[in-house]
C-alpha cells in the first residue's frame, strides 16, 4: 500500500501544482478546536497537514509556536490524546498528515510504539527537527517496517552534511529557508535557489520550503524553487488571536485559500 504522501505529490505533479502544507499545534487552544481547524484546512485547499506535538523544550520553534505549545501542555495534553484526535479527524480528512515532534518526546513514548501507534491512528510520517544523524538509520529502519516516513529536515549547511541528512529520504524533504528558529518573516534570503539546487543534487524526493513564509506573496516567490511550501507561524498567529473560535477557524481557512490560490 503506497504511503499517502507519495500519492499526494504524484497527484500534484500531474496537476502542475505545489503543495500547500499548513502547520497547527495539537491541542491548542483545545483538542476539539484543533480537530475543527484540521477539517477547515483540508476544505480550504491544504494538500498535507503538519500537526505539532507540543514539547517543553522546543529548540527550533519561534515565540508564536512556543506560546501554543506551552498552552497545550498546560492543559495537560498527552501524546495519546493527539493519537486519539487523529483517529477522530481521519473520519473526515483524507489528505496526508505528518507530525512535527522532537526526538525527546518520541523517545520517551517508546520509539517503535510511537511509530506503530501513529501509523494506526492515521498519521503518515513525522518531521523530527532535532533527530541526531547517528540515530537516523535506527529510526528509519523501524519506520520502514510500518510504511511510516521519517521526513528529513535540512538547513542551508554544507553539501556533505545535506547529503548525509537526505540519504534515503522518503515522502518529502523539509527545507528550512533560514538558519534559526521558526517565525514570521517578511524577507527571505535570495540564495534559496542555490541551496535548493544542492538539496536536489543529493535527492530527487520532493522539496518543501518552510520556516518564515508568512504571506501568499512570499509563497508565490518560493514556489519556483520547490515542490511545496510549509506555513506554520503565520497560521498559529491567527489561532492565537483573541477572537471567537468560530471566527478564528474561518480566518485560518481564508488564509489557506489565499496561499493555495498562488500555488
From Swiss-Prot:
- Coiled-coil residues are none
Superkingdom assignment: Bacteria
* Location of the active site: 50, 61
One family from Pfam that matches here is Trp_syntA
Task: Look up keyword Nucleotide-binding and say if it applies.
Answer: no
**InterPro entries from the UniProt entry:** Aldolase_TIM, RibuloseP-bd_barrel, Trp_synthase_alpha_AS, Trp_synthase_suA
Cite the GO molecular-function annotations of the record: tryptophan synthase activity
Gene3D superfamilies hit by this protein: Aldolase class I (3.20.20.70)
According to UniProt, the reaction catalysed is: (1S,2R)-1-C-(indol-3-yl)glycerol 3-phosphate + L-serine = D-glyceraldehyde 3-phosphate + L-tryptophan + H2O
Query: Cross-referenced CDD domains, in alphabetical order?
Result: Tryptophan_synthase_alpha
What EC number(s) is this enzyme filed under?
Answer: 4.2.1.20
Keywords on record: Amino-acid biosynthesis, Aromatic amino acid biosynthesis, Lyase, Tryptophan biosynthesis
Keyword Cell membrane included in the entry's annotation: no
Known partners and oligomeric status: Tetramer of two alpha and two beta chains.
Function per UniProt: The alpha subunit is responsible for the aldol cleavage of indoleglycerol phosphate to indole and glyceraldehyde 3-phosphate.
Which family, according to UniProt? Belongs to the TrpA family.
Q: What is this protein called?
A: Tryptophan synthase alpha chain
Q: Specify the species.
A: Clostridium acetobutylicum (strain ATCC 824 / DSM 792 / JCM 1419 / IAM 19013 / LMG 5710 / NBRC 13948 / NRRL B-527 / VKM B-1787 / 2291 / W)
Name the gene behind this protein: trpA
Amino acid at each position: 500500500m503506497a504511503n499517502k504522501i507519495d500519492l499526494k505529490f504524484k497527484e500534484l505533479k500531474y496537476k502542475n501544482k505545489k503543495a500547500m502544507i499548513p502547520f497547527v499545534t495539537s491541542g491548542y487552544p483545545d483538542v476539539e478546536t484543533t480537530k475543527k481547524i484540521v477539517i477547515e484546512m483540508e476544505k480550504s485547499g491544504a494538500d498535507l497537514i503538519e500537526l505539532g506535538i507540543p514539547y517543553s523544550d522546543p529548540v527550533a520553534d519561534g515565540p508564536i509556536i512556543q506560546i501554543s505549545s506551552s498552552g497545550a501542555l498546560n492543559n495537560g495534553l498527552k501524546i495519546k490524546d493527539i493519537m486519539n484526535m487523529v483517529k477522530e479527524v481521519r473520519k473526515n480528512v483524507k489528505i496526508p498528515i505528518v507530525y512535527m515532534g522532537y526526538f525527546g518526546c518520541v523517545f520517551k513514548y517508546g520509539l517503535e510504539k510511537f511509530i506503530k501507534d501513529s501509523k494506526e491512528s492515521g498519521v503518515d510520517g513525522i518531521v523530527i527537527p532535532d533527530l541526531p544523524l547517528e540515530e537516523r538509520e535506527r529510526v528509519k529502519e523501524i519506520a520502514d517496517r510500518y510504511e511510516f516516513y521519517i521526513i528529513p529536515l535540512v538547513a542551508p549547511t554544507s553539501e556533505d552534511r545535506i547529503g548525509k541528512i537526505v540519504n534515503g529520504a522518503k515522502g518529502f524533504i523539509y527545507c528550512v529557508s533560514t538558519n534559526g528558529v521558526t517565525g514570521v518573516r517578511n524577507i527571505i534570503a535570495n540564495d534559496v535557489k542555490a541551496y535548493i539546487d544542492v538539496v536536489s543534487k543529493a535527492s530527487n524526493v520532493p522539496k518543501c520550503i518552510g520556516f518564515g513564509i508568512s504571506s501568499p506573496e512570499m509563497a508565490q516567490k518560493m514556489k519556483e524553487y520547490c515542490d511545496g511550501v510549509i506555513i506554520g507561524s503565520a497560521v498559529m498567529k491567527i489561532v492565537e488571536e483573541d477572537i471567537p473560535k468560530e471566527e478564528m477557524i474561518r480566518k485560518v481557512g481564508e488564509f489557506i485559500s489565499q496561499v493555495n490560490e498562488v500555488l
